[in-house]
């Protein structure tokens, strides 16, 4: 199935006061933590933006410019992705540690219940944040992300059954040569493909490999009901009209235990929706923030 190839290629490719009201305008600032680099700028109701595997915060540049005049933006980047210096410590248990680190930063800066936007792996991190730290996520916009990628292998797939495959992908990343072309189905534009390839080439293979394994083998579906009190919107890519029914069915099944989630298809887009369909993405973000 081509839809499976899209998402598996994404994995293999990287083979305020405390209310939602007015906020004092903080100075633009960047802080490097153990696992994350966080940049905060602007004022207004806070919005956290979390990119995906091997991606920088810059993947959100266009929409950040659009919404930045009305919101305090908290731009998150995993250290080791897209040119940032990797962590000097162990990278195991990366995603839970990064989520806890983000929650701690938000708490230290007296930011409660921000809107959180996460793409791909960043979508999983957003859901983990909302479950583990309810005060750190007021609403979620999940962008082309499934709660368990293993479901693409069939209804009997589990984290244990897909682990050997993703461990092979990790080994290929760590021991292989630098990629020379962007993997398929990441973007449908030459500009988007060039950006994605540059980010991938600039990423630390060890960090990306660990994040890949954790992302692919985390099954968040049993935890989705814990988000029932959270406003959740899920955007998902539909590369062509022939794939719409398949994509619709996949996302309905994936999020069936979260009936309050609003599922929104984005037509004529590959995995990086914000690069392929910036107008549709901007409209979806603005609707989410209203």
Residue ranges and their predicted role:
Residues 75-117:
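Active-site loop/oxyanion-hole signature of alpha/beta-hydrolase fold enzymes
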Residues 275-287:
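Post-His helix in hydrolase/transferase enzymes
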Residues 231-269, 275:
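Conserved loop-alpha-helix segment in the C-terminal half of the alpha/beta-hydrolase fold
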Residues 151-157, 169-227:
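Conserved alpha/beta-hydrolase catalytic His-Asp/Glu region
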Residues 118, 122, 126:
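Gly/Ala-rich beta-loop-alpha elbow adjacent to hydrolase catalytic centers
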Residues 34, 39-86:
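Conserved HGGG/HGGXW glycine-rich cap/lid loop of the alpha/beta-hydrolase fold
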Residues 131, 138-171:
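Flexible "cap/lid" loop of the alpha/beta hydrolase fold
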Residues 1-47, 68-72, 93, 112, ...:
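Alpha/beta-hydrolase fold catalytic core
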């Amino acid at each position: 199935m081509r839809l499976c190839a899209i998402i598996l290629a994404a994995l293999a490719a990287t083979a305020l006061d405390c209310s939602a009201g007015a906020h004092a305008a903080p100075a633009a600032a960047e802080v490097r933590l153990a696992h994350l680099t966080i940049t905060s700028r602007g004022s207004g109701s806070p919005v956290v933006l979390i990119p995906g595997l091997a991606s920088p915060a810059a993947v959100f540049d266009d929409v950040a410019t659009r919404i930045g005049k009305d919101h305090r933006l908290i731009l998150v980047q995993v250290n080791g992705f897209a040119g940032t210096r990797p962590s000097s410590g162990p990278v195991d248990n990366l995603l839970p540690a990064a989520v806890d680190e983000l929650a701690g930063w938000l708490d230290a800066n007296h930011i409660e219940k921000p809107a959180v936007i996460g793409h791909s792996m960043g979508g999983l991190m957003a859901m983990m944040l909302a479950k583990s730290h309810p005060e750190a996520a007021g609403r979620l916009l999940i962008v082309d992300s499934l709660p368990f990628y293993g479901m693409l292998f069939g209804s009997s797939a589990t984290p244990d059954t897909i682990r050997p495959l993703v461990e092979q992908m990790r080994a290929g990343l760590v021991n292989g040569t630098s990629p020379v072309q962007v993997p398929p189905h990441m973007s449908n534009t030459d500009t988007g493909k060039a950006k994605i390839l540059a980010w991938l080439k600039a990423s630390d293979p060890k960090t990306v490999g660990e994040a890949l394994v954790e992302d692919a083998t985390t099954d968040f579906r049993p935890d989705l009901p814990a988000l029932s009190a959270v406003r959740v919107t899920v955007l998902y890519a539909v590369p062509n009209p022939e794939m719409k029914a398949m994509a619709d069915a996949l996302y309905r099944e994936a999020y069936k235990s979260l009936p309050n989630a609003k599922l929104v298809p984005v037509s004529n887009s590959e995995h990086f929706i914000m690069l392929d369909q910036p107008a549709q993405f901007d409209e979806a973000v603005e609707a989410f923030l209203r």
